[in-house]
Structures are given as C-alpha cells and as structure tokens.
Amino acid sequence: MSHVANKLLVTCALPYANGSIHLGHILEHIQADIWVRYQRMRGKEVHFICADDAHGTPIMLKAQQLGITPEAMIEEMSKEHQQDFAGFNISYDNYHSTHSEENRQLSTKIYLALKKNGHIKSKTISQLYDEEKGMFLPDRFVKGTCPKCKAPDQYGDNCEVCGSTYSPTELINPRSVVSGSTPVMRETEHYFFDLPAFSNMLQEWIRSGALQEQVANKMQEWFDSGLQQWDITRDAPYFGFEIPDAPGKYFYVWLDAPIGYMGSFLNLCEKRGDLSFDEFWNKESKTDLYHFIGKDIVYFHSLFWPAVLEGSEYRKPTNLFVHGYVTVNGAKMSKSRGTFITARAYLDHFDADCLRYYYAAKLSSRIDDIDLNLEDFVQRVNSDIVNKVVNLASRTAGFISKRFDGKLAANLDDAKLYQHFVDMQESIAQCFENREFGKAIREIMALADEANRYIDEKAPWVVAKQEGKEAELQAICTMGINLFRVLMTYLKPILPSLTERSEAFLQTELTWNALSQPLLNHEITKFKALFNRIEMDKANAMVEASKSTIAPVKEITGPLADAPIQETIKFDDFAKIDMRIAEIKQADFVDGSDKLLKLILDLGGETRQVFSGIRSAYPDPKVLEGRLTVMVANLAPRKMRFGISEGMVMAAGPGGEDIFLLSPDSGAKPGHQVK
C-alpha cells in the first residue's frame, strides 16, 4: 500500500444496536485492532474509534417488541457491545453512539451544507405502505424477489446475492416484514442526495489505485449501470434525527451512520482537549483516514460516503479496507446448529487471543471469506502458540531459574541466528503494513520452527547433565529466551494478552526498536504457564451453549407495545412526586376546547383547579362529580389560555375514548398521600 501518514484516524463499521456481537462481527474489529496495534508499535499517532449505529426502524420495532423505549434499548446494547470488544482486547480510544448530540449537530451541518451547495433535491415519490401497521415501510422492512437476478427473499434496498441496489418499489412480489401483508403504494415527499453529480470525482478515486482491486472493479460495475439519486428521507414513525424544516421527515440511517465516525471523533476531541477535529476532517487534512468494513456495505462507503463528504466540503477517506464474511465449519452461521456464536459465548469458553490468532492466520488484503473450522482452530492454536512459541520459553526458562538465579548470559550462543531473526523484521513489517496477516504468521512460524530446531540440536537437557558445561547451558538457554522474545515482539499486535504475560516473565517491554539489542545479563522471573492448551470438548460445549442461548424475542403486544416503559429513574427522583387523593367537586366542559375538562378538586382542606384532556372519555362530565381520584399535587402551576392548571389527575389508557380515571380503594380520603 502507499505511504501511511504519521497521524491516522482508523474506524470500524458501526455495529447495529439491535443485537449482540457475534463472531462474524468480531472479525473486522480484530483485523483493525491488529493493524492499529502494529502502527502504534511503529511510532504512529493512531486514533481508533467506533460507535453503535443506533437509529432506524429495526431498533424502533425491536424496542416496541421488548416493551421499552429505543433509548433504553440502545443504552443497554452499547454497554454489552463495549464489554464484548473489551473482552477481545479491541483497543478503541473512543466508543460512542450515533444517537448523540455530536452526531445530531454534524448531521444537520452536513445536510445544510449539501442543500446550500445544490446537492439536495426534493420530489414526491410513491412508497410502499403497510395498511395493517399504518406506516410507510423502510427498504429493510420490505422483502421480495430481486428485480435483477430474481433471487427470492431479498430486502428492499439491495440484493445480498448479486449486490445490486434498487428501490423497494422495484421488488417483485413485495411483502411487509412487519406484518406479512402485501403493501400498497402511497405518495410522500422525500429529499434526495444528488449522487450522479459526483460521478467524475468518484471515478478518479477508482483510478487512483488506492482501493482494493475487487472494490474498484465492483465500483466500476455500478458506474456502468448508472448512479442514481439517493433517497435520504424516512417518514415518521422513525427513530432517528428529524430533518431540519421538514416535520415528520427523518434522516435515513445511512446518512447519519457514517457521520457517526465524525461524531465519535468529535466526542473524543471534547474529552481529550488536545485533539483538533479540523486537523483530521478538513478538506486539506494531511492525516490519513481508514475505514475497515465488510463487503456488504461497500456501496455505501465507496460511493455515498465520499460523495457526501466532498459535497459538504470535508476530506474523503484515504482508503477502505474491506473483508469478507465468516462461515463456521464450512457453512453459514446457524442458530439451530449452534454455530451462530456470540462474542460472549466465545469468551465464556476461550481466551480472546486464540480467535485473534486464528483469524489473523487466515486474513489477507483480499476480500475473501474466512471459515472458522473448529477442529482446525483447536489444532492450530495448540500447534502454533503452545507447541512452537510458548514451548520455546518453557524448554529453556527452567534452567535459567534453577541454575543461574534467573540471570541470562552475557553472550548469545549463536549471534548469527539471532541476527537472522532480527533481519526478518522488514519483511514481517511489510506484511503487517499491507494487512497480509496470514503471510506474517507464516513467516513468524517459520522462524519458530528454526528456533525449536536450534533447541532440539543443542539439547540443553543433555548439556545440563554434563559437568563443566554451565556457561554453555546458560548461553543456549539465553539464546532460546531471546528467540522467544523476538517471536513475541512480532506477535504482539495479534496476541495482546499473551504479550502482557510474556513481558512480565521477561521483565522488559517488547518493542520493535529494541530487537537489535538482545537481552544479556538480564534477570527474568520464574517461568509460569503463559498459555494453556485448548480442547475440542470446549469447542463442542460452546456450540451447545450457543444452541440454547439463541432464542427468538417474544413479541410484546397490547399496552406495552403501544406505550413502551420509559427509561428508569432514580428513587430520589420518584420521591419528589407528591401524589394525593382528591375529590372531584365540580366537572365542566371548557369553552373553545374539544379535549379538556375543567375539574375542581378538594384535597381535604385545599381546593385546586385542574384542566385535564379526558373529555372524549367522559362526554357527560357530571358523572365524575363526587368521585375520588389521584392527582399530582406538587406539579408547578401551568398557565393555559383557559386559566391556571394547578396539578394533574392520573388516568390510564391509550387515549381518545379509552381513558380511565384512576380511583383509590375504599377508605382513602381527600388529602391522603399516595405511597
């Protein structure tokens, strides 16, 4: 790849906040983290950020199914996602959410800049509408047959089989994912981003040679079929940011989602105080911006995103690093087979370094799918990490501790061999730089084989039994420890947990620059097991656990679906509310209002006037007179055009005629406090 700047901003695609992280997701975050850790080892200033993609109809509907607000759901998802990434040692500098004030401000600013520069068009469109649910259907909530390749069961925005994009109205035999009904067409006004206006700029980007060949080729296919204006609007109900000056219209999630990269970085700048947002995002920035993404979202990142940035006068990405999908045991991940494995299920059974190593061994700069074969996974981890690398230290460290009080020799037994290991750093560095992690591991394991052959030939266990061979034994074991140190330095970006334990054992930090100088006359600690073998039984247990933990979300219907439970509050906040029993002494219509009733309430020594929106439920207000009810007594008086309302009566129900005034049990009296 081309020269990397000294300052880098690196992102992973934003996980969607409606489900758990699984082993398909984690591939990308491991890939990016390895590259980031390598760049940091080489002295680069790297800012590694991510966020939850927290908007859209799927989140709104799932929260409704769960009977909670979208805000409450995405908050819990964010906590879970961050715990999972921490469990895999993903070294983010900041993890944020697209449902943030930073993202709202930036989305609005970018939209207004695009509009000012003439890149936003409006037009009336016909859109699919679910009459059963009373809502316009976003593209991901329509399924049907792809109009291009005729693949069945495809979403309304793009085909997962042929990669084509289209509008939901082009689907053959569309159906609503929400209700299963056949949608009808209705007209609505939408705003569009003028993507074709950026065709020349985007084609220059293709010809620059920076993009992966497979990405550039796919982009050319899209150009050949013609770019279309991009609908950036969604109709209410929708969980997201409302478009300025367009009530009831919301930004499509794919407009504000990539802006989430900027929002997360802005949040980091605000936290740190010593970072400049403009230095990394202004049009003339000298820094590098890299996005690690999956091949399923190339279209949005290679066309829409750079065009949106160009149109709003921000810098474009330096490059996209695209990876393929993950299969398990040669097949698509399956909940029924237990191969739909969540990050948490994996971490309950294995060290994160095991999967980091296995994925790294299979990763290249190409967009190839990766198969997680569990038998191969167990065999490779044991063969490479345990038998080849850690075993090198365990075969020599004991002699150093027992015979030489933990002190390494003053000289190496084979300085030429050590120099050969050090000389490989340039080749291995190039592999890391170019994201050819599999090649890097092959080169490192070839060195590990050489190191173990050296120990086999020198046989320190034999030398230890020979009198007068102490210096030779110390030199051989010192050599083995130093070769282990070189190998672990090369593996440091991949195996952070093992590296940390190895640094404690060696009592030195493993750095690229220190490789030229071996550890001599240096004291190490007593060797303890650095890494344990893994067993197939645990892999089988993980699969079984995954079968039992993946369960369909129980759909909540009725009142909780219509009015989800709000976010939790602290007890101290609840305790501030003073609810009292009140007798309705008088109830009358309010002139000029078809919703309100005027209630005169007796609190047992004090009278209050309250305006309540319950007229539809009580067409004869006189039936309320003499009833006891519950009121919020310490609500601040509210001035209305009909008079002052001095509290609020408590009622239940969805609204309209279905409102039911609350009444206390017998024995309660006006003025009693509700506890």
From Swiss-Prot:
Residues in tRNA-binding domain copies: 573-675
Domain of life: Bacteria
Location, primary (coarse class): cytoplasm
EC id: 6.1.1.10
Chain positions recorded as Zn(2+) binding sites: C146, C149, C159, C162
Keyword Isomerase applies: no
Pfam families for the chain: Anticodon_3, tRNA-synt_1g, tRNA_bind
Binding-site residues, ATP: K335
Example of a GO MF term: methionine-tRNA ligase activity
Co-factor(s): Zn(2+)
A cellular component annotation (GO) from this entry: cytosol
Disulfide bonds: none
Keywords carried by this UniProt record: Aminoacyl-tRNA synthetase, ATP-binding, Cytoplasm, Ligase, Metal-binding, Nucleotide-binding, Protein biosynthesis, RNA-binding, tRNA-binding, Zinc
Catalytic reaction list: tRNA(Met) + L-methionine + ATP = L-methionyl-tRNA(Met) + AMP + diphosphate
Cofactor note: Binds 1 zinc ion per subunit.
One of the GO biological process terms: methionyl-tRNA aminoacylation
Short motif 'HIGH' region, span: 15-25
Location of this chain's protein in the cell: Cytoplasm
Sequence motif 'KMSKS' region, location on chain: 332-336
Oligomeric form and interacting partners: Homodimer.
Family: Belongs to the class-I aminoacyl-tRNA synthetase family. MetG type 1 subfamily.
Purpose of the protein: Is required not only for elongation of protein synthesis but also for the initiation of all mRNA translation through initiator tRNA(fMet) aminoacylation.
Name of the protein in its database record: Methionine--tRNA ligase
Organism from which the protein derives: Proteus mirabilis (strain HI4320)
Gene this chain is encoded by: metG
